[in-house]
């Protein structure tokens, strides 16, 4: 019969005829056959199954073997023995390799045919050993899947006892070696199905023998924690996670995180690879285990691992959001990684450039699942932008993209952040620096945050962008000096010429830090700026003294510094008096003078004092009460003398009698340094010669320029704050003035006027007020509009007699140290004359982001003003200011500078502005500067720099001795150039080493992102270093299996 069958299958007869004859052969199996005939038939059918030329031959072999084995079971039992099966497994069958899946399929079917025979027990024992050997040989996924099918049907073949543990461990290793090289969907689905069969086998073994579970999991961790660069465990290991009981999470994570034998590098690798498991489709609970391990590492304060893993894998996790099968798990892990990474915005900024595209894509498909996902993503994004406020250039597109989705409340955001922090109060978070790459497209260099040094960085960038000041500093010949100015020159040179994206100002920080400033803690940028300018000023004065005492020692350091300051630093000024050669660089650039007048309202005597200033502190004032917004008759107010003006008593014979003409404004304000006594009655006073005042004009009118609260109809402007600053003040109540003529405390009027303007006007908005009820400093979050052009009233003081001849009436100014209620009387004369208005252009703005003075972040907006801006025409003073009421002279809304602001707005908008945010520098616009507080309520302008413009032609001439200054900075000294060249070479070497490290896939590559000079146990700050937005796309993401 075997000969007939063999000839039939190889014949050329039609297929229907062959099938009919095969059917007859199968039916003949019921007849008796001797043992030799049965063995011949079994040999033939085995050969057809394993070596059949086509599917028909293999099909015939299966049908005939099954029929003859069923009717001739003892003969088949004798044929399918241990020796035959062992030979198949170890040597194969003729031309069929032993690892061919057909061998396992044949054995699988053979076991089914002799299941009821006694000899099957011997085969089970044999297979328990052989399957372990096969698994140790790391079979391919398809063979391993067929083996899993066999062992699932015949659990008796699964190794027992100690061999069972070994078998599970080896099977885990085998899964770790699985790879799928195909990219076709059909092959990928088959691969996933094969891996699922193997993982299901392991699950069944774990259930049957629980003692095998823990060793299997240990083997999983050993595979994924391997630091061998030549081996990358397969992501197919993720298929095992869903079979691990969730009840074991706590025990396993504690064991892993506290085991001293587990090195940080191994733990980093393991965690990274577990995050890679998010790419595996159909895997459940991967996100649960990943988050549990992240929390476990945080609990034992292994923050270095968390920082490294987050920065390495945040892009991959975010990219998983594009795929529906793994999106829920990816979002859960992404949320935890971002919300717990609270010491630095670097991780969040890596994904920021890609959020808008993701949102737009999911909004366009319109699926309910996409909408629900976007709601969750929007909440996460709002939490991150709240925590890392101070990056408007990055966040504005995101806010626009998610504006239609609900925004969580501030209370909810705080709760989420508090619950997600690695520790509630951690002192072990490391300040992880940004990856340093080449300069940004702006061509500007950032400053690395050394640990809560954003207050210094923002000020230094503002000073660097003060073009005239920067050029004067760079032009100094300070070789041999070790002064603070030398260090500033070194810093400016690196900011201008380094190839690095960001520079670390460590040396300058240590030299310029005020002694009372605690390192790595939050500080006030305005306080730092004042200290810095004062240090530079006093240092130059000391050098002058040293130079004058050593005239015969040649050009030593002191003389060299003095020569450069006195000869090369020549800033044009119109103020007479002290020559420029006697001024320090700081005085020439930032120095101005204020003249204070105090008039006793009892005897009329006055005192005068002139003080130098480098900045003006502008206080806020609250909205006036409803009662104050009405006209008040002077008859209803306390009065001194109704007719006749009292002549002042001049104590100083060189000073002229002062005629006071109060402006028509009344203010009440309470600020951090200027606290006025509320409720004290306004006093009407006269300190001048008699003049006729019509009754209609003898009324007090609240100025239209009183700043409004945020809820009011108008927005406070810098001009409003200057109005308030320059308004006269009445000293009454507890703030009475001690008059030497009266020898007692008396009511008095205190005014202040600017007599000499600075080249760069620094304005500090006093945003931090002291809350007497709670004894804390609070921040004033009022929005303040910033004019591009500002006109400062300046009254020259070259000669008092000449002033009295030119101006018929003095203009009054207030003190900056005391804020008391003021009652001002309108002018009754037509001879009111305004001081000279000096135009200034906005140069830079330092912004504070935060809600208190003890926390937050500083960044700055700035632009280059080289002194060549002539895009505006000043309104002639004779036309716009002559015979104007004194109220207009105080920069009110009716003053000429308001018109200039409107004319300039569109023209100046197109000029380049830069946003300096620690190491990140980006292009921006003046529109962004104007809208910063309206878009981000915690971000408010704090320190402003205005550059003076010449009235003659709108430009300030450059130093005539330096012709190259016209279009650029002066050439650097050789010492500075050599230092920069050396550092640029070092930078190129660093880039090369980093490239090699990335190529070798070093496990500790991310550690290079942290500075060597800082301790990982230093406390974190809320204004850490930035990462520059990531960029570059998802080039590190591996191929997904879908």
Swiss-Prot record:
Swiss-Prot/TrEMBL catalytic activity: Thiol-dependent hydrolysis of ester, thioester, amide, peptide and isopeptide bonds formed by the C-terminal Gly of ubiquitin (a 76-residue protein attached to proteins as an intracellular targeting signal)
Family assignment from sequence similarity: Belongs to the peptidase C19 family.
Subunit record text: Interacts with isoform 1 of FBXW7; this interaction prevents FBXW7-mediated degradation of MYC.
Designated name of the protein: Ubiquitin carboxyl-terminal hydrolase 38
Role, per record: Deubiquitinating enzyme that plays a role in various cellular processes, including DNA repair, cell cycle regulation, and immune response. Plays a role in the inhibition of type I interferon signaling by mediating the 'Lys-33' to 'Lys-48' ubiquitination transition of TBK1 leading to its degradation. Cleaves the ubiquitin chain from the histone demethylase LSD1/KDM1A and prevents it from degradation by the 26S proteasome, thus maintaining LSD1 protein level in cells. Plays a role in the DNA damage response by regulating the deacetylase activity of HDAC1.
Gene this protein is translated from: Usp38
High-level lineage: Eukaryota, Metazoa, Chordata, Craniata, Vertebrata
GO cellular component: cytoplasm; nucleus
EC numbers: 3.4.19.12
UniProt cross-references to PANTHER family, sorted A to Z: UBIQUITIN CARBOXYL-TERMINAL HYDROLASE (PTHR24006), UBIQUITIN CARBOXYL-TERMINAL HYDROLASE 38 (PTHR24006:SF710)
Annotated active site: 454, 857
GO MF assignments: cysteine-type deubiquitinase activity; protein sequestering activity
Source organism of this protein record: Mus musculus (Mouse)
Compartments reported by the entry: Cytoplasm; Nucleus
């Amino acid at each position: 019969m075997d000969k007939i069958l063999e000839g039939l299958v190889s014949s050329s007869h039609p297929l229907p005829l062959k099938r009919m004859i095969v059917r007859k052969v199968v039916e003949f199996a019921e007849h008796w056959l001797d043992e030799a005939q049965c063995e011949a038939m079994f040999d033939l059918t085995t050969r057809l199954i394993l070596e059949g030329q086509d599917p028909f031959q293999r099909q015939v072999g299966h049908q005939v073997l099954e029929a003859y084995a069923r009717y001739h079971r003892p003969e088949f039992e004798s044929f399918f023995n241990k020796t035959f099966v062992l030979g198949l497994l170890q040597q194969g069958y003729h031309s069929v390799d032993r690892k061919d899946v057909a061998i396992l399929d044949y054995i699988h079917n053979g076991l089914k045919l002799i299941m009821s025979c006694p000899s099957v027990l011997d085969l089970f024992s044999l297979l328990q050993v052989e399957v372990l050997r096969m698994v140790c040989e790391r079979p391919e996924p398809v063979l391993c899947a067929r083996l899993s099918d066999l062992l699932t049907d015949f659990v008796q073949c699964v190794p027992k006892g100690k061999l069972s543990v070994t078998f599970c461990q080896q099977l885990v290793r085998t899964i770790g070696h699985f790879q799928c090289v195909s990219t076709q969907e059909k092959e990928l689905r088959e691969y996933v199905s094969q891996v699922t069969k193997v993982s299901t086998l392991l699950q069944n073994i774990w259930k049957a023998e629980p003692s095998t579970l823990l060793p299997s999991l240990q083997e999983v961790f050993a595979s994924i924690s391997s630091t061998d660069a030549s081996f990358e465990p397969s992501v197919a290991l993720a298929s095992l996670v869903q079979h691990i009981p969730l009840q074991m999470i706590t025990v396993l994570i504690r064991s892993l995180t506290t085991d001293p034998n587990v090195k940080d590098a191994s733990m980093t690798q393991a965690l990274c690879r577990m995050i890679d498991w998010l790419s595996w489709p159909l895997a459940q609970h991967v996100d649960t285990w990943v988050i549990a391990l992240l929390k476990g590492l945080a609990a034992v304060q292994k923050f270095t691992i968390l920082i490294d893993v987050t920065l390495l894998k945040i892009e991959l996790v975010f990219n998983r959001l594009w795929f529906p099968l793994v999106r829920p798990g990816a979002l859960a892990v992404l949320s935890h990684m971002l919300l717990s990474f609270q010491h630095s915005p670097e991780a969040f900024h890596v994904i920021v450039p890609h959020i808008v595209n993701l949102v737009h894509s999911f909004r366009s498909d319109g699926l309910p699942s996409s909408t629900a996902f976007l709601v969750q993503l929007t909440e996460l994004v709002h939490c991150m932008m709240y925590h890392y406020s101070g990056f408007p250039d990055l966040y504005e597109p995101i806010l626009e993209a998610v504006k239609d989705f609900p925004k969580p409340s501030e209370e909810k955001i705080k709760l989420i952040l508090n619950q997600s922090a690695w520790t509630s109060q951690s002192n072990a978070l490391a300040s992880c620096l940004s990856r340093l790459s080449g300069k940004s497209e702006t061509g500007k260099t950032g400053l690395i945050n050394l640990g809560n040094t954003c207050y210094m960085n923002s000020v230094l960038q503002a000073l660097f962008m003060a073009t005239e000041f920067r050029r004067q500093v760079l032009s100094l010949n300070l070789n041999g000096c070790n002064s603070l100015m030398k260090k500033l020159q070194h810093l400016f040179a690196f900011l201008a010429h380094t190839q690095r994206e960001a520079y670390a100002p460590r040396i300058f920080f240590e030299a310029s830090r005020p002694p009372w400033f605690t390192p790595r803690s939050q500080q006030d940028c305005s306080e730092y700026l004042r200290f810095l300018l004062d240090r530079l000023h006093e240092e130059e004065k000391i050098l002058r003294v040293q130079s004058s005492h050593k005239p015969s020692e040649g050009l030593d350091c002191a003389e060299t510094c003095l020569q450069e300051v006195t000869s090369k630093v020549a800033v044009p000024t119109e103020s007479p008096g002290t020559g420029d050669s006697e001024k320090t660089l700081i005085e020439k650039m930032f120095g101005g003078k204020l003249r204070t007048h105090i008039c006793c309202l009892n005897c009329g005597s006055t005192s005068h004092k002139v003080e130098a200033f480098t900045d003006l502190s502008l206080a806020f004032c609250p909205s006036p009460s409803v009662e104050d917004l009405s006209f008040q008759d002077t008859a209803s107010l306390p009065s001194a003398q109704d007719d006749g003006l009292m002549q002042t008593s001049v104590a100083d014979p060189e000073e002229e009698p002062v005629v006071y003409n109060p402006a028509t404004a009344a203010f009440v304000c309470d600020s951090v340094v200027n606290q006025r006594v509320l409720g004290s009655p306004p006093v009407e006073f006269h300190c001048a010669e008699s003049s006729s005042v019509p009754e209609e004009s003898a009324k007090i009118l609240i100025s239209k320029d009183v700043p409004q609260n945020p809820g009011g109809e108008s927005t406070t402007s810098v001009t409003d704050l200057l109005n308030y600053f320059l308004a006269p003040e009445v000293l009454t109540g507890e703030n009475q003035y001690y008059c030497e003529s009266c020898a007692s405390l008396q009511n008095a009027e205190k005014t202040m006027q600017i007599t000499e303007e600075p080249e760069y006007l620094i304005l500090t908005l006093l945003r931090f007020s002291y809350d007497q009820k709670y004894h804390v400093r609070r921040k004033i979050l009022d929005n303040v509009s910033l004019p591009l052009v500002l006109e400062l009233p300046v009254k020259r003081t070259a000669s008092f007699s000449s002033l009295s001849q030119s101006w018929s009436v003095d203009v009054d100014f207030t003190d900056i140290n005391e804020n008391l209620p003021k009652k001002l009387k309108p002018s009754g004369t037509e001879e009111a004359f305004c001081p000279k208005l000096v135009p200034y252009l906005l140069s830079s703005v330092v912004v504070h982001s935060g809600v208190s003075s003890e926390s937050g972040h500083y960044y700055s907006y700035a632009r280059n003003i080289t002194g060549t801006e002539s895009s505006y025409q000043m309104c002639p003073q004779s036309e716009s200011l002559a015979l104007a009421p004194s109220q207009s002279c105080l920069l009110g809304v009716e003053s000429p500078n308001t018109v200039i602001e409107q004319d300039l707005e569109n023209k100046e908008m197109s000029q380049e502005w830069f946003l300096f945010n620690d190491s990140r520098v980006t292009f921006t616009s003046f529109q962004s500067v104007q809208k910063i507080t309206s878009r981000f309520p915690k971000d408010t302008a704090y320190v402003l720099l205005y550059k003076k413009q010449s009235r003659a032609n709108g430009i300030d001439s450059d130093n005539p001795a330096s012709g190259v200054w016209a279009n650029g900075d002066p050439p650097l000294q050789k010492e500075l150039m050599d230092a920069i060249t050396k550092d640029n070479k070092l930078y190129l070497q660093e880039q090369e080493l980093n490239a090699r490290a990335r190529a070798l896939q070093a496990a500790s590559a991310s550690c290079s992102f942290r500075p060597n000079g800082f301790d990982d146990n230093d406390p974190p700050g809320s204004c850490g270093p930035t990462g520059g937005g990531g960029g570059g796309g998802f080039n590190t993401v591996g191929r997904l299996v879908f």
